[in-house]
Amino acid sequence: MALTEPVYPPLIMPDSVERERVTIWSKGVALDADLYRPRAVPTSTPGVVLCHGWGGSKLTCERYAALFAEAGMIALTFTQATWFGSGPHLRMRAQHPVSDAPADESPEAHRVRDVVDPFDWLHNFRAAVDYLEGEPGVDRERIGAWGTSFGGGVAMHSAANDRRIRALSVQVAYVASLAGPQLAHANQRAIDSARGTYDPIADGFDVMPGLAGFTDFARWTQYDVLGQLDRLSVPTVMLDAGKEELFSIADHCGRAYEILKAKPGQITRYEVIPDIDHYGIYFDGYARSSQVAVDWFRDHL
């Protein structure tokens, strides 16, 4: 969730792992993706889909994916649509209402980039699971989901609603819904979009202060990760930063943990890594966060 993507420590590819650049197709949009697999792939091995956060890319996840592959899994990272190497969205903007449009008039097509639409991110994550499910060597009964920051909420929402996902690991995850003035603004955007009095192409998408890209607020009103937790039943581990500066961890994974641990039979774990901030999870917190995720998938996939 950054204005610019931090420069992360470089990936040192293990000798036992190979990486292949692939394309995932999601609603006709090409998603830039990388597949990590052990060089000696067993006949049937677990697979993990990884989701980056706001302003990130597939490279945010590369060290985690390589580590999963080194542990014997097949891992898939991808960049969300409209960001970096993935394809744009095409938005059509007509000059007239449909009923009044001249027969010879074609609507204008606009390429849209760097937009956060949570439901589009969910669809792209599902497409990534579809892709991984068809990868030779992947055991379809042992697919895991991993997500970081805003992508952690996407992974959690997906795990609650996709029966193919059997284990979940998230870190510094943003999972709370919009509230207060932001929710009121999003509701108004949805109303105005439906009534044709607001056009994000002509009027501009909203910007979240301090964050890269743009926000399609009209699409946020029904995005509720915590509201999905009654359907989440897979083993779930959540990691937070002790000095998180972007949001209150008590309102996000802290709240998710309280909900999950109250569910009979739910396997869940919550850990706060001390002395790191949000982006510290990729630096001083990397050794701990990555090992917890690897161990979780080993135990539950």
Region spans (language model):
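Catalytic histidine-centered segment of alpha/beta-hydrolase-like enzymes
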Residues: 276-287
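The serine-hydrolase catalytic nucleophile loop
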Residues: 54-67, 80, 250-252
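Active-site glycine-rich loops that stabilize anionic/oxyanionic intermediates
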Residues: 45, 50-56
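Serine-hydrolase catalytic core
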Residues: 205-276
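N-terminal cap/lid segment of alpha/beta-hydrolase-fold proteins
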Residues: 2-43
